[in-house]
Regions:
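Hard-cation-handling environments
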Residues: 1-84
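Extended hydrophobic packing segments that form well-structured cores
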Residues: 53-167
Length: 167
């Protein structure tokens, strides 16, 4: 499989050892304690890059700066690690890094699935998107987006046993 992740410390380690080098460390889980623990990796550095990534579907001048990039392999999983946040649903980072995602069995992206369908149309068959049910804005369960306190309650879909009604 292949995925993207922001982790400046892992990128730094990758740049220290260079392409072909081996890095050990804890990947991810460093922003907060809501999205899981870091995982221990023992990875080989496959590629290093430092450029802005063209935004898919935008004009030719639109770019996103994700900082330095390290492409690593951990147990057969290709991980694109960036220094800054990378909005994978809005950009073609894999194409820009010459990573052919069509050869992978799984492509792990966290974000808005409708945006994925646009960006990856023709690459990933329609209906083959698995929507991650994680905390925050990316969850299909809006109750996980946070605590809603300034709205009339009970309300669908935030409260149980409340039917949807259009007003």
């Amino acid at each position: 499989g292949v995925c993207t992740m922001r982790d400046p410390q892992i990128v730094e380690k990758a740049y220290e050892v260079g392409v072909g080098g081996n890095i050990r460390g804890m990947l991810g889980g460093k922003v907060d304690d809501l999205h899981g623990e870091p995982i221990e990796i023992n990875a080989t550095v496959k590629m290093l890059d430092d450029r802005e990534i063209p935004v898919a579907g935008a004009d030719s001048t639109s770019r996103q700066n994700v900082g330095r990039i390290a492409v690593i392999d951990h147990d057969g999983i290709t991980i694109v690690v960036t220094e800054a946040k990378a909005a994978t649903e809005l950009m073609n980072i894999f194409k820009c890094l010459n990573i052919d995602i069509t050869g992978y069995k799984a492509l792990l992206l966290k974000g808005f699935n409708k945006a994925y369908e646009e960006v990856y149309e023709g690459i990933v068959p329609t209906g083959h998107f698995l929507i991650p049910d994680s905390l925050g804005i990316t969850s299909p369960d809006v109750r996980k987006a946070g605590h809603f306190t300034k709205i009339r309650r009970p309300v669908y879909p935030l409260d149980e046993n409340v039917a949807f009604r259009y007003e």
